[in-house]
Amino acid sequence: VLGATQKNDGNISGNGYIVTWAFGHLVGLAMPDAYGIENFRRENLPILPQSFQLIPRQVKTDKGYKPDSGTVKQLKIIKEVFDQCDKIIVATDAGREGELIFRYIYQYLECRKPFVRLWISSLTDKAIRDGLQNLKDGTMYDNLFRSAKARSEADWLIGINASQALSIAAGRGTYSLGRVQTPTLAMICSRYLENKNFVPQKYWQLKLQTGKDSIEFSALSEEKFDSQQPAIDKLQIIK
């Protein structure tokens, strides 16, 4: 669509454009050790950074977390592209997380180049061409970014503090809590306990048998009755 056909390491160029990409969140919020807080100690809680630091995506190793080499390489390529361009066309997903992916990279690389937004929901050639003809000012999505940033920081505050608090209270092991994962796990556990403690009970339903033009069919009520009499009463109403 753009006419950029020259494939390079980490980008594609041509026709006045350089196209590069991110693979997920290349930049995220730093862990507590970046603020000088190491190990799980009760006196450190709650951990409330004055301002959050951005770092490249980390991977866990035997010696702790370290920057992912592929992420660091791609960020270097993106910075080189930013340095070469006059203006940035942001083409990340048209949504909150897509906006956050770009803005965190933009902030981490301390870029000051102006940017506009390609806002499309289809990846057909026509949709892309139409979107390029109707680029939006990047500032139009500042509030979308702020909402994504608030979600990201809230997840950090809840996850870090709750995980450390539970681990300290338990006295051994490391336990992970999160805004999404913990309620989801609670739903799974609740359902498991319901099934485990389930005791079969007798119930009644209404069944209707009817037909038309020699075609017979039956219908079963969604409502279930704990005893027979309420079912009979409802049946009389229907009749």
Feature roles, as predicted:
Residues 1-152, 156, 220-237:
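Intrinsically disordered, low-complexity regulatory segments
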Residues 151-223:
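Prokaryote-biased recognition of long, low-complexity C-terminal linker/tail segments
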